[in-house]
Amino acid sequence: MKTHILRHGQTEYSTKYLVNGDPSVPVQLSEEGVRSCQRAWTVLPLHSLRTWVASGFPRAQQTALLLTGVPAADLVIEDRLNELDYGEFEGGPFLGYGDWLDRRGAWRRPPGAAESQREGIRRMLLGVQACLALPGPRLLVSHGLLLSVLFWQQNRPAGEAMPLFFPEAPCLQPLDVQDAVLGGWIADLLSDLDAEASQDPDDRGDAAI
């Protein structure tokens, strides 16, 4: 069985590289984002999907509904696929958060945030893992960080440690993965996170407190 995972369609926030990790902020798709969803019919086997899953964010759910072409009463909402909580950086440029992350490390929670970058990645991976129990083939509509991590894992050189920053994942570019392969990726990534978390805080850039 196969899982198709993609980042939501383009938004005004994404074109300006602004961060939104608060699902109560109504960030919707831009006009181009809506058009891109219509074009996605040519690259996704939408007719064969049995389960549709979206994060708890409006832009992810809007993307899923546009891809179905009809109101999807059976759309599954999986909050563990949500975007990272950026805390006080909410609504600001990614560069501001990125500079803070570079200085403070992947395990430190930004002021006002409920999770660190690594804690957020773990949450997202557990969300994907849970979705593998749903009837397949399935489509998961999530956010950039999760897709960036999975694309990195797909092309990961042997022995390479998880980086602090990942290449940006394009909107609506699907990652199509056999369930057995995806399950192996998740297990490897969770193991990496466990190994990082067990290190001395000084060696991993400050533990979340």
Where are the predicted features?
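Generic beta-sheet signal
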Residues: 3, 134-144
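Short active-site segment of divalent metal-dependent hydrolases/proteases
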Residues: 11, 146-147
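Acidic, low-complexity terminal tails and accessory targeting/binding regions
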Residues: 77, 83-95, 151-209
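Short beta-strand scaffold positions
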Residues: 54-55, 122, 141-142
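Active-site-proximal alpha-helix that buttresses catalytic centers in soluble enzyme cores
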Residues: 2-70, 100
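A short, acidic, amphipathic alpha-helical segment used as a generic capping/interface helix at domain edges
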Residues: 120-134
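Phosphate-handling substructures
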Residues: 27-28, 67-123, 165
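Glycine-rich phosphate-binding loop signature in dinucleotide/nucleotide-binding domains
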Residues: 45-48, 131-136
